[in-house]
């Protein structure tokens, strides 16, 4: 099911990552001689908020300044790992987290970061072991629970995934990211109404979350609600919404409707739309095969 959704262009979300250029000096400042001074709690909180708000340039600049003044503060090393992870630099993040995973007050978060990084690197077995260690250390580590849910989901261990997502939702006050991830798992299981409920809840928490909106449209289309699935799509998103609806129609073996939707997607694009063209070709071929199969059965 996930492969199909990828072809359809539906957005997937396992862990929220945004990539950007590293701020100069951040990841080299640890080479300075140890400084016994600690950063102010307010400074640490400001850097964390900047990372949480995806203001990575601000976070990088503030972190660089803090490290210059208090390079001995292990909390800053942890934040450097968090910033690397948020930017998609998993290997670099691993190095940072490993430096502080023996610090008692930081161990839970460091193990969580290592586990998420391992998951992003595709080292699934190691990731699961590390993430389980993280939640054993800190049962409220919701990002570790979310990543565990994603790992179990990938392996179609639905019961464990459901339990992990439940922990993540409880400890994160119903994070929209976790709601979206659980919704996509349920979509994969054809639990369409439950998936739609999760996507709607995610959008209520974060109305500007495109992955949840795209997944909601896909779930509606999978129910055969094609018009509803593309209703309200912005002009720049309409072609993709129609393509996704068309692919959902293919999965439903509704080939005639699929061809109509995919043709509309190509027109809405205003130019060549390779994905919609490939899906249209697939719909036509499957329709031909289906008709031929039906004819064979009728002759028997």
PLM features per residue range, with description:
Residues 40, 74-75, 107-109, 142-143, ...:
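Helix-start (N-cap) detector for alpha-helical repeat units in TPR-like alpha-solenoids
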């Amino acid at each position: 099911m996930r492969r199909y959704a990828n072809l359809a262009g539906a957005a997937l979300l396992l862990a929220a990552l945004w990539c950007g250029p590293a701020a100069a000096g951040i990841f080299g400042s640890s080479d300075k001689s140890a400084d016994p001074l600690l950063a102010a709690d307010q400074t640490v909180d400001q850097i964390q908020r900047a990372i949480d708000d995806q203001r990575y340039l601000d976070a990088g600049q503030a972190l660089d300044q803090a490290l210059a003044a208090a390079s001995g503060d292990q909390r800053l090393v942890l934040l450097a790992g968090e910033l690397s992870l948020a930017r998609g630099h998993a290997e670099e993040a691993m190095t940072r987290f490993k430096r502080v995973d023996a610090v008692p007050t930081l161990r839970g978060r460091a193990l969580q970061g290592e586990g998420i990084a391992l998951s992003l690197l595709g080292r699934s077995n190691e990731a699961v072991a590390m993430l389980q260690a993280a939640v054993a250390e800190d049962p409220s580590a919701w990002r570790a629970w979310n990543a565990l849910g994603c790992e179990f989901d990938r392996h179609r261990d639905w019961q464990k995934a459901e339990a992990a997502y439940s922990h993540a939702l409880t400890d994160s006050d119903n994070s929209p990211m976790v709601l979206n991830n659980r919704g996509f798992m349920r979509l994969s299981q054809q639990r369409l109404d439950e998936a739609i409920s999760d996507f709607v809840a995610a959008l209520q928490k974060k109305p500007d979350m495109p992955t949840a909106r795209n997944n909601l449209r896909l779930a509606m289309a999978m129910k055969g609600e094609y018009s509803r699935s593309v209703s309200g799509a912005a002009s720049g998103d309409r072609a993709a919404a129609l393509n996704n609806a068309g692919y959902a129609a293919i999965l439903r073996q509704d080939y005639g409707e699929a061809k109509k939707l995919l043709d509309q997607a190509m027109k809405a694009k205003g130019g060549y739309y390779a994905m919609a063209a490939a899906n249209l070709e697939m719909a036509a071929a499957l329709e031909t095969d289906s008709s031929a199969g039906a004819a064979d059965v009728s002759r028997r």
